């Protein structure tokens, strides 16, 4: 929210929003997922948001790829949905970030890269931070094992996949692991801790927000001034 507000967006957090429905779909409860989608559809329309912005790769994938079918009986979701990296890619040139002399590695969430095709977009956001050294792991797009309900229903397998991912990331010797999904962030933090690593796991937008907070002075309002975003993610975002 801080980054979007700094860029001039009016950010509205919709507490009444339902879950995107991804866990329900994974469990096979399509009827409940459809009800959640219709609730969100009505809410977005009633609040007159300009776009929905989400910082969760799974939510973004669900809105973009699953909602057209889930909303077949009630009409389309008539508001653009963007992952936060898509918005950041537009905003980076005007954000006051200074120079960050830091070595980081990137973990690509399955639902961001393979699901939404935004792997290059996300990495371009990181690379546009002056001074940052982005070191790729041997398998940057390998699953972390979180998998939403998989972590609950198949905990041992989820941990085993996470441990393998942690080993790969530790091979970069980067003190910071950056990812674009809260679920991946939680899984990687626990996996790295079990492996004895002191690496910190951050969401991309956290790094941007930290840099803005550290840099004194402002360039004024950005190109998003006056737009509304909804959060779960919106313009109202």
Q: Where are the regions a protein language model picked out?
A:
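Iron-sulfur cluster-binding electron-transfer modules in prokaryotic oxidoreductases
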Residues: 1-237
